[in-house]
Amino acid sequence: MGNLFMLWAALGICCAAFSASAWSVNNFLITGPKAYLTYTTSVALGAQSGIEECKFQFAWERWNCPENALQLSTHNRLRSATRETSFIHAISSAGVMYIITKNCSMGDFENCGCDGSNNGKTGGHGWIWGGCSDNVEFGERISKLFVDSLEKGKDARALMNLHNNRAGRLAVRATMKRTCKCHGISGSCSIQTCWLQLAEFREMGDYLKAKYDQALKIEMDKRQLRAGNSAEGHWVPAEAFLPSAEAELIFLEESPDYCTCNSSLGIYGTEGRECLQNSHNTSRWERRSCGRLCTECGLQVEERKTEVISSCNCKFQWCCTVKCDQCRHVVSKYYCARSPGSAQSLGKGSA
């Protein structure tokens, strides 16, 4: 039962707010082939890896992949079709494929191993395929069986979710690296043997975050949709999601600005959020987080000084311990706060 709970926790809770029954893991476990229970722990770890990467990628965004929002009720009216939804589906699907592929190459499953289908073939000038390529075909197949099988709808939102699931899996392939080993007399490297390996998961997260920033909004023909709502409609034409955009993230609805709290929609606003200011070793995007999270949402940046205790003046003593002093120093942290004695100014476009 522990593995089943992990899977439900990683996929069911994390994604319930975004696609209702589409992410009902219990439905899959009841109706899915029993053989797939072999992979439930890896699927759970993959989905959790996706959510953790989501939190990293959006740490300094107004929407920061919040736990509470992901545990929101699955009532249909709360199902969104925003670009944030698209990222959740893509990174979760990619995470499952990634971990399954890793475990396969490590020999954790009896029915799969390295992909040697191209071994011995010429790959390019001076190199041939060989070694142990990561078996992405297997990882993709299991990810698709688990994740896509949870999407029961036939409407525009369901097609959007399935598209973004696939875009996530394509991201795993797109970020793979070719690794080579030299062969030849005295290390001359006259020929190389090469194989494909998964990139670091962070690199794939960066890749999908760039896709999120450039996500495509799909304008549906409302005459072919029921109730005039693009996310709730049916009779969605197959050509609505163009094959030429198969690797892109797509969405149907514009996002709110996420400045203002709206708990019924799982939006918790930016009041109280930490931001970075004058920090070293940070990107320009991170350094601008105080403006994005606070100022642009009608909040002020509040400095709070905190005393931190850390080890210092450490010395090695024979044998064999390290002795350290406990040093105290004050650090400044910055948070979004309302101006004293005034009401919060609402960000435009709030939910």
Curated annotation (Swiss-Prot):
UniProt-listed CDD domains: Wnt_Wnt8a (cd19351)
GO cellular component assignments: collagen-containing extracellular matrix; extracellular region; extracellular space
Residues spanning the signal sequence: 1-24
Sequence similarity: Belongs to the Wnt family.
Gene coding for it: WNT8A
Molecular function via GO: cytokine activity; frizzled binding; receptor ligand activity
Species assigned in the record: Homo sapiens
GO biological process per UniProt: anterior/posterior axis specification; canonical Wnt signaling pathway; cell fate commitment; dorsal/ventral axis specification; neural crest cell fate commitment; neuron differentiation; positive regulation of transcription by RNA polymerase II; response to retinoic acid
Keywords: Developmental protein, Disulfide bond, Extracellular matrix, Glycoprotein, Lipoprotein, Secreted, Signal, Wnt signaling pathway
Lipid-bearing positions (O-palmitoleoyl serine): 186
Residues with attached carbohydrate: 103, 262, 281
Compartment(s) where it occurs, according to its Swiss-Prot or TrEMBL record: Secreted, Extracellular space, Extracellular matrix; Secreted
Protein name: Protein Wnt-8a
InterPro entries from the UniProt entry: Protein_Wnt-8A/8C (IPR034312), Wnt (IPR005817), Wnt8 (IPR013301), Wnt_C (IPR043158), Wnt_CS (IPR018161)
Keyword Lipoprotein carried by entry: yes
